[in-house]
């Protein structure tokens, strides 16, 4: 777009954004002019009219009070994000690509991992080198020992350390008592022991016995937004309460020890991580809350077999359990994302972008079928983007298809580099990065978007209620000076 046309578009967007003010301005001027012409006699006549029509006046105020009451009772209750906390694993669990591959070779030499050829080792190493992950991501202790420890007890220890650590830090930062929590929602896709993870938190923090608790399983990397949406729904029913949302994934029990290439990819991408989020519907909490939840949009295309089967946990030909990623995954993800954007767009985009979309649609429909679809400028709707750090290719495609800048996807790339794919909690590490960089100001709008098995694409939209500073023990506070880093890898090699 050349410079003159760009200026025209900016001016048009400004007109559309302030259309109501511009429309009402002439009306207000006319009212002011007419009011200035009123005489003292006109005002006295109006006063006498009110004195002689008590019944009409009473009915007017009665209807006004009734309407106001009904509006206040039926309108959606605001949901505030008081604070959130991301888990930072201990430093001894850091594992570079070299350390990981050395350990894999030792495991293989010990006979615990019977890979058929060196080709699979080279495949894993290439995935690690090109994934966008850095050299300080965290691998569970049970996977850094010889022999590997993948039993239920060790897996439970990993998850307990993550969720308890995140929640404990959240309680310390907010000063909230565990007994104040009325709603608890926990999500973990592939690790769901009995008692549940939500029960672990109830027991550890002695949460009250009438708490409304949910434990979401098997819902993939997009489950963090699903958990937020579930908590939002419960907060519409239960007044003056707090909701605690916890998102995590277990790595220990999900290491794949077979020879299927489509199942080895997840070994290379997923790392330890988890987040705890405190929500509130109490009006008094607005003053100290960081954000207000504006929208949640959920899309599930599982009715289509290709969507349903593109990411599944299953046994390979040798009976070894892993998560298989099909070749249809990019196509399915693009289709599901498109539906989510089509649903979210009308809710958040300014009318100018809706107008451009409509014009392009008419041209394509009636004049030129080969014309490309109009891609809305989502930077007019959001200041910050938290795109699920599922992998470098995913972030690249989102940047390209949504016409984003490197700065727009910086939080996602740096989260992938520093922490790896932490599944449903990655969008919270990204938000923590934005806060740590001091970029979050009052009124800023944030788009969190995550994709996961099923196949699902879910979005949440927040607005900052103040200039947000990073909370104590922000996961980036010890390494922020290193970021952003330059990531230059040729994926075509």
UniProtKB/Swiss-Prot annotation:
Main localization (coarse): membrane
Regions crossing the membrane: 52-74
Keyword Transferase: yes
Pfam families for the chain: ACP_syn_III_C, FAE1_CUT1_RppA
Membrane topology annotation: Single-pass membrane protein
Gene Ontology terms, MF aspect: fatty acid elongase activity
Pathway the protein takes part in: Lipid metabolism; fatty acid biosynthesis
UniProt keyword list: Acyltransferase, Membrane, Signal, Transferase, Transmembrane, Transmembrane helix
UniProt GO BP: fatty acid biosynthetic process; response to light stimulus
Location within or outside the cell: Membrane
Catalysed reactions, as listed in the record: a very-long-chain acyl-CoA + malonyl-CoA + H(+) = a very-long-chain 3-oxoacyl-CoA + CO2 + CoA
Any single Gene Ontology cellular-component annotation: membrane
Broad EC category: transferase
EC number: 2.3.1.199
UniProt KW Lyase keyword: no
Residue positions of the active site: 221, 300, 384, 388, 417, 421
Similarity annotation: Belongs to the thiolase-like superfamily. Chalcone/stilbene synthases family.
Record-given protein name: 3-ketoacyl-CoA synthase 16
Organism: Arabidopsis thaliana (Mouse-ear cress)
Gene responsible for this protein: KCS16
């Amino acid at each position: 777009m050349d410079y003159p046309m760009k200026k025209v578009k900016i001016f048009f967007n400004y007109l559309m954004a302030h259309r109501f003010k511009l429309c009402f301005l002439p009306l207000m001027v006319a009212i002011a002019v007419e009011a200035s012409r009123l005489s003292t006699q006109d005002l006295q006549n109006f006063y006498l009219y009110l004195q002689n029509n008590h019944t009409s006046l009473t009915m007017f105020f009665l209807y006004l009070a009734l309407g106001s009451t009904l509006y206040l009772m039926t309108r959606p209750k605001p949901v505030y994000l008081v604070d959130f906390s991301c888990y930072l694993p201990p430093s001894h669990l850091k594992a570079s690509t070299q350390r990981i591959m050395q350990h894999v070779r030792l495991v293989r030499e010990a006979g615990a991992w019977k890979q058929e050829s060196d080709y699979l080792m080279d495949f894993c190493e290439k995935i690690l080198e090109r994934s966008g992950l850095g050299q300080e991501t965290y691998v569970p202790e049970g996977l850094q020992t010889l022999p590997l420890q993948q039993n239920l007890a060790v897996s439970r220890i990993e998850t307990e350390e993550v969720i308890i650590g995140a929640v404990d830090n959240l309680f310390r930062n907010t000063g909230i008592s565990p007994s104040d929590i009325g709603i608890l929602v926990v999500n973990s896709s592939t690790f769901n022991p009995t008692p549940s993870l939500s029960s672990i938190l109830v027991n550890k923090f002695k949460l009250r016995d009438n708490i409304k608790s949910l434990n979401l399983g098997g819902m993939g990397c997009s489950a963090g937004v699903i958990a937020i949406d579930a908590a939002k729904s419960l907060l519409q029913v239960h007044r003056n309460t707090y909701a605690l949302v916890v998102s995590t994934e277990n790595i220990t029990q999900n290491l794949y020890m077979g020879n299927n290439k489509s199942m080895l990819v997840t070994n290379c991408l997923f790392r330890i991580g988890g987040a705890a989020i405190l929500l509130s519907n109490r009006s008094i909490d607005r003053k100290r809350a960081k954000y207000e939840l504006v929208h949640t949009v959920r899309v599930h295309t599982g009715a289509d077999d290709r969507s349903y089967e593109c990411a599944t946990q299953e046994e390979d030909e040798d009976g070894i359990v892993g998560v298989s990623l099909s070749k249809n995954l990019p196509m399915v993800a693009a289709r599901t994302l498109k539906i989510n954007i089509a649903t979210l767009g009308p809710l958040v985009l300014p009318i100018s972008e809706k107008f451009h979309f409509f014009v392009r649609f008419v041209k394509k429909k009636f004049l030129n079928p080969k014309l490309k679809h109009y891609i809305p400028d989502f930077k007019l709707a959001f200041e910050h983007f938290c795109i699920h750090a599922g992998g470098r290719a995913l972030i690249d495609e989102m940047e390209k298809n949504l016409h984003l800048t490197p700065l727009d996807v910086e939080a996602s790339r740096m989260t992938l580099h520093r922490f790896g794919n932490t599944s449903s909690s990655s969008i919270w590490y990204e938000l923590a990065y934005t806060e740590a960089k001091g970029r979050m100001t009052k009124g800023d709008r944030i788009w969190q978007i995550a994709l996961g098995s099923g196949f699902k694409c879910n979005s949440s939209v927040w607005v900052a209620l103040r200039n947000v500073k990073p909370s104590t023990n922000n996961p980036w506070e010890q390494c922020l000076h290193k970021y952003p880093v330059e990531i230059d890898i040729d994926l075509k090699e």
